[in-house]
Structure formats: C-alpha cells, structure tokens
C-alpha cells in the first residue's frame, strides 16, 4: 500500500520490544491512528523526541495490517517543552489528550474538527495566558459538542423551550424547564450556566470575570456530564482536581452527580 502523510497530535506512547514504541496519534484526515515508531528509543534515533505526547507533527506513515509504521516525522509545534515542566499545565494537557482519544471514535475515521480543537487547546495551555481550569472546561464542552453530547444551556434539553432555565440534569441532557424537570435535578447558582455558555462560545472576557465558586461548580458539571456519556471516569481528571485543590463539597457534589445520573441512565 502507498505511504500517506497527515498532521497529527501525539496522544500517548508505550514501549514495544527493545527499541521501538507504539504511538497513538490523532490525525487530521485519518482520525485515530496507532503506529509503530521503529528504533526511536535508541539514542541515535532521528525523530524519537518528535513523537513525545503533546507534539504536533507532520507524519509520513506506511499502512499496516494492525499497526501502521512511522517512516518520517517533521515537528510543527513543540508544545511539550512548555507543558511538561509545569505540573498544572501537564495535568490539564493530559486530560485533554485522554478526552481526545476517547471521543475520536473508530480508528481511521476522519476527525478534522477534533484535531483542530485539540491543537488550539494545547497551544493555549502551553502559552499560559489563560487560566488552565477554564481552558480545560472550554475544551471539554467543545469536544462534547463535536461528539454531539454538549449539554443544553440556553433551552430546555427535553422540550426546547427557550431559557434561561435554572435546573440542570445530566441524563436529561442539560438545563431543563420547570415542566420537564426530572427528580434529582440540581439547581446551580445564578451565573453558572452563563459561564458554561461563555466557555463553549469563547467569550473569555465573561469567563475570566466569573467568581472562583462558579468556576468550581462548572468544572463539576462539565466533568460529570462528560463522564456520564463516556460511562466511565477519565483517569486524568482526579489529578487536575488535586492540583486545583478542589474543596470537599465540590468533590462530593461531582461524585453525587455522576452516581445519581448513572442510576437515571
């Protein structure tokens, strides 16, 4: 089969044999690709350092039966240098990479929107000009939008009655009107759903002006909504929570939301 080229974000890697690695890539035109990078663990490898997680690359690959083979790599953006040396950026970036892999769908299914979103998010994390908690929640909301899971924020998730509505229920799909409100719905403080809308829409002025209590509440809702749809917890999110020192009430509320909506689902 013919070689092909594609732009990719390196999501993760693991050892194979004495000198090789298997890398998981989120490519622009071929979606999720798993490939063998031969000899990259040797000190004389030409492109081993370019295949670290967080790297944005132009790769040439040879199609294989189960795994493709990386034959050439050109670095486009070296985000890792600015991310891995800062624990907060690192845990935030890891949560983004794990989410990207989980939402990419079947291997080789084109994912240009998710690829573009992930590159932009990693660039923002590496730049460090915006709060990492807001960047992560914005990424998760927009990634869910690409997957078709974004919560309803401006209308009722069940009957589409225009909002704003105060109640929120994950299994119902987001905000719900008084007539559709299921048992067990939560009522976020005023401004929380507005903050979620601002993050989804890219209104950074409004998002960065929100109080920390609202930001913490949003993080809980966003994580619970995503993990309800994934039907399992992201391994990296607890690390992010520890970095931001989420208070006990936020952690308990997040666990309650996930548990409650798993039963409803």
Swiss-Prot record:
Function: Involved in DNA repair and RecF pathway recombination.
Organism: Mycobacterium ulcerans (strain Agy99)
Family statement drawn from the similarity comment of this UniProt entry: Belongs to the RecO family.
Record flagged with keyword DNA-binding: no
Pfam families (alphabetical): RecO_C (PF02565), RecO_N (PF11967)
GO biological process: DNA recombination; double-strand break repair
NCBIfam families registered for this protein in UniProt: reco
Cellular component GO terms held in the UniProt record: bacterial nucleoid
Domain of life: Bacteria
The entry's keywords: DNA damage, DNA recombination, DNA repair
Entry protein name: DNA repair protein RecO
InterPro entries: ARFGAP/RecO, DNA_rep/recomb_RecO_N, NA-bd_OB-fold, RecO, RecO_C
